[in-house]
Regions:
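C-terminal lobe and adjacent flexible extensions of AdoMet/dcAdoMet transferase-like proteins
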Residues: 236-240
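The AdoMet/dcAdoMet-binding core of the Class I SAM-like
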Residues: 2-9, 56-189, 196-203, 210, ...
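Short, basic/glycine-rich phosphate-binding loops at helix/coil junctions
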Residues: 44-51, 186
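Conserved S-adenosyl-L-methionine
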Residues: 214-225
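Active-site beta-loop-alpha junctions enriched in small/polar residues
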Residues: 192-194, 222
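N-terminal auxiliary segments of SAM/dcSAM-dependent transferases
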Residues: 1-47
Length: 240
C-alpha cells in the first residue's frame, strides 16, 4: 500500500497507531491554537484532524454526539458547551428541544468555519433554532472566571488534555464548572479511552471531580471507530 495516502495518528504513551487511507486533502491550515486538516476518505467521508489527531468524520460522528446527548438530562433548559465548535452536540440538543438555550464557548473560530464548510449537517437549523444557540469565541477557562449564569448542564467537548485543552482537565477548571451549575445540575466531559487512559486520565479526573464536591460520578463508554482503541468515554457528575 502506498504510504503517501495513509494518515496516521500515533499515541506515544501506548505505542499504538490508528490510520486511514485518504483520497486527498480538502483543507489544511495552522490556526492560532492548532493545526487543522480535513481529508477526504472512502470509508469515513470527510475527516477532521486537529494537531494530527482524528476528531470528527461524516460517517461515525454520531456515535460520540448521540452518547453525549443521551447523558444530558432532557429537562436541561440552559446548557453550556465548552468546545463543540463543530455544532454536533448543540444541533442535536436543539433538535431534541427547540426551546433549549445553548451557549457554545469555542476557543478557535477556525474550527467553526471549517466545520460549517466540510461538515454542514449540524448547521442546517431553522432560524429559531439558530437564535437559541449563542456562539462565543473565547477561552473556556477565562469565560467561566467571569461567568455569572447558573446552567442546568455543562458539557466539556474538548480535545485531549494537551495544548490549549490541558487546562480544561485541571481541578481549578472543574471547580469553576461546579460553581457555574445549578443545584442538581450535571457536568459531562470527554474522558479519553477507557482502555488506554484509565490510569493517566480517567482515575485522576474522578479524584478531581470528587475533591470539588461533585457527586454521582459515572463513566460511560461507547464505540468510536476512528479514535485510539476504538472505544471512548464520558465522565458525568452532579452538583450536590
Amino acid at each position: 500500500m502506498d504510504t503517501k495516502n495513509i494518515y496516521y495518528e500515533h499515541d506515544d504513551t501506548s505505542g499504538t497507531s490508528i490510520c486511514v487511507e485518504y483520497e486527498k486533502y480538502l483543507y489544511k491550515c495552522q490556526s492560532k491554537y492548532q493545526n487543522i486538516e480535513v481529508i477526504k476518505t472512502r470509508i469515513y467521508g470527510n475527516v477532521l484532524c486537529l494537531d494530527g489527531c482524528f476528531m470528527l468524520s461524516e460517517k461515525n460522528q454520531d456515535y460520540y454526539h448521540n452518547e453525549c446527548i443521551d447523558l444530558t438530562p432532557k429537562k436541561s433548559k440552559n446548557i453550556l458547551i465548552i468546545g463543540g465548535g463543530d455544532y454536533g452536540i448543540a444541533s442535536l440538543l436543539i433538535r431534541r428541544n427547540k426551546n433549549t438555550k445553548i451557549t457554545i464557548v469555542e476557543i478557535d473560530k477556525k474550527v467553526v468555519d471549517v466545520s460549517k464548510e466540510y461538515f454542514p449537517k449540524h448547521f442546517k437549523l431553522s432560524s429559531q433554532q439558530l437564535n437559541n444557540i449563542n456562539l462565543i469565541i473565547d477561552d473556556g477557562m477565562i469565560f467561566l472566571k467571569k461567568n455569572l449564569i447558573k446552567y442546568d448542564s455543562i458539557i466539556v467537548d474538548s480535545t485531549d488534555p494537551v495544548g490549549p485543552a490541558k487546562i480544561l482537565y485541571s481541578k481549578k477548571f472543574i471547580k469553576l464548572c461546579n460553581s457555574s451549575l445549578k443545584k442538581g445540575g450535571v457536568i459531562i466531559q470527554q474522558s479519553g479511552s477507557p482502555i488506554n487512559d484509565m490510569d493517566k486520565l480517567i482515575k485522576p479526573l474522578v479524584k478531581k471531580y470528587d475533591s470539588v464536591g461533585l457527586k454521582s460520578i459515572t463513566i460511560s463508554s461507547f464505540p468510536m471507530p476512528l479514535y485510539p482503541t476504538g472505544t471512548w468515554s464520558f465522565i458525568k457528575a452532579k452538583r450536590a
